[in-house]
């Protein structure tokens, strides 16, 4: 039996041992040979290994029984899965309830985690699955008790806008995030619907809440291509923003003195 076949047998057995609700609402996913890893965003740039564990801050109706590493196939998926980066910038690192001692440098490290097989829950187990495309790396055998991680990109927030579009014609207020992304090595999917992007510098404009007229088939819990715009930028433009206080929008809140410094990564 080859190693891949053994992994498949092991993860099938692992799923069979889960609770009925999990078994009914989970899918086994095999790694794509052209993109054999998932992504995980963190303010901690010193993670060597990721250990599957129960969710510490589960969302509404999120599964609380399966130990896992929360991952997604794209940067936007990671952001939707847990937008801790904007939260930290607005309210301070410790306000999020983390006990980790991390030198927060005002940005997110994007890790790649290679895998053979993983699990894909549906909305019954992860309520924001339609936006995050969350996957789980689970401990289904001895080789998957830990997953190795490698930093391949860095993400910073350059601007956040709230735009009131009114209440006529079913419009929704816009929340617009502007991120800058440095892809350092390998290729990275920025959005769930596009091909991976090569190393370089990118500006991401993300309309987290669409300011559009809603229609009968519009689902605010599902990602659509109109929500994201990606533009390649120069290294000098990226560095120019990185050296500023990030972002200026948040510096008047008064209780995030940690942010009053330049980027150091």
Indicate where each model-derived feature is located:
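NAD-dependent ADP-ribosyltransferases
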Residues: 2-265
